[in-house]
Amino acid sequence: MSGKLYIVGVGPGHHDHMTYRAKQVIEESDTIVGYATYVNLVEDLIQGKEIHSYAMTQEVERAHQCIDLAKDGKIVSLVSSGDPGIYGMAGLIFEILAESGWDPKNDLQVELVPGVSALNSCASIIGSPLMTDFAVLSMSDLLVPWEIIVKRVEAAAQGDFVLVIYNPSSKKRIHQLQDTRKLLLKYRKPSTPVAIIKGAFRDSQTVVMTDLEHMENYADKLGMISTVIIGNSSTYNFKDLMINPRGYKSKYNLDEPEIKN
């Protein structure tokens, strides 16, 4: 029997936001591999299956095991929160396979199952913050030097992109978002809207609406399951929502469906 490897995104954490395909392949799989927290997100879907849970920082071991299990004939789901192709395990899996001389057409079958990423789920909670161009950045410097991250932040700030920040801080990493805030204040008003979403669509979900000047007051809301969305020069708040206008107001009368001359 030939095995298969699914790299599965399970979304933000609630089954309502998991794709039909993700549920389908998890059900089809006889073996589940993943970071323990992510495995727990699908605990009720994997009863009776062979389960391999890993701690954080064991990504390489996790990747090799799921590849080996699939090569041995298992149907394996490697589960990730959000989308595995965005700061997820997909990149590492394909790097390892490429290094081994893998032939996608004739060797091990691999299917990437996309999921709802944090940028989608968090944006939906706070309104319409991503209507114009935006940049997605991770503050984690475990694999990318901080100097490179700073260059990317500055480029995004100069380009007036809305920013979506993943991995804003951890117990060992607290200065990165503070440094980012200082850099952004060179280009943006202190009143620029900021949203901090932690645990989107999980029972522990919290949402803080603040601004660039005061965002450092909410360090307790930051962590590895937090996402920070920072507006651009046109972003504004309306009640508990963040709105990033697409530009219709400059062309249309929003009270009447008529195109302006």
Predicted regions and their residues:
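Class I SAM-dependent methyltransferase SAM-binding "motif I" and its flanking Rossmann-like core
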Residues: 20, 88-159
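Short, ordered loop/turn segments at secondary-structure junctions
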Residues: 37-38, 82-84, 142, 199-200, ...
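A contiguous loop/helix-start segment that scaffolds small-molecule binding in enzyme catalytic cores
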Residues: 5, 158-261
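Class I S-adenosyl-L-methionine
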Residues: 1-110, 218, 257-260
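A polyampholytic, Gly/Pro-enriched intrinsically disordered region
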Residues: 74-80, 128-138, 157-159, 213-224
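Short gly/ser/thr-rich secondary-structure transition/capping motifs
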Residues: 12-17, 144-146, 209
